[in-house]
Amino acid sequence: MIWKTLIVAFMATAVLAQEIDLSDQRREQYRNMLAAQCRKMGAEDKVKDVESSVRNFVECLRGIVDPQAIKKEIEEAKPKGELDEVFKKYCAKAPVLKTCISSLLDGVRPCVDKVAIDHYGPLLNTTNQLIDFVCYKDGERIALFIAHGGSECFKNSTEDLKKCAEEMKNSFPSVEAAKAMSLPDKCGKFDDLTTCMVTSLEKCENPTPANMAESLLKFIRKDSPCNAAVPKD
């Protein structure tokens, strides 16, 4: 049900964010899908409000980080061994990002069903903890990841990672079958995906990216219902 919230947010963002490479036709398609979802929830009059909340979210992200600027800063800091200073600066903005995400979830609420809304708490908690994970010790983890070739490792492993995702997707015969699957079985699928991704990244010359990816995925699992349903060491 969390995915319903994310899908509504994505559709609205795709309509508004010019940085997303979409044709006018595709953008209009997402606009119509958003309107249909709001209409389904009896909130067709709230479409503009939802779009406004997403517009504010996009502006919030722009205020936190400029992708081109941070890319340049990383390139300049990496040979000097000063990546920690770059991420320390951006991680200082983590509280603002958390507020932006919370506001976004509140903004799309009118067009999301009650079951999905009931998952808002866990979703917000998970996103906050992911931000805390990335920004642990002022961004030490992400700085180490970049310094040890994390970006290059992921780029070189793109095809293998895609295969992992495809295997996961193909393991579900249908949407209905996925919904009917028991929680332990779903957790097993997540564990299989984790193993596949980590194995792919372990082919890189430096083990750090694989180790950090594994730590992140374990962190996500620990904060999910899987931790109680299928405990792991």
UniProtKB/Swiss-Prot annotation:
N-glycosylated. It is found in: Secreted. Disulfide bonds: none annotated. This is 27 kDa hemolymph glycoprotein. Keywords: Glycoprotein, Secreted, Signal. It comes from Manduca sexta. Residues 1-17 form the signal peptide. GO terms for cellular component: extracellular region. PANTHER family: EG:BACR42I17.2 PROTEIN-RELATED (PTHR20997:SF2). Glycans are attached at residues 125, 156. Hemolymph. The keyword Secreted applies. Its main location: secreted. Belongs to the UPF0408 family. It holds the Pfam family DUF1397. It comes from the Eukaryota.
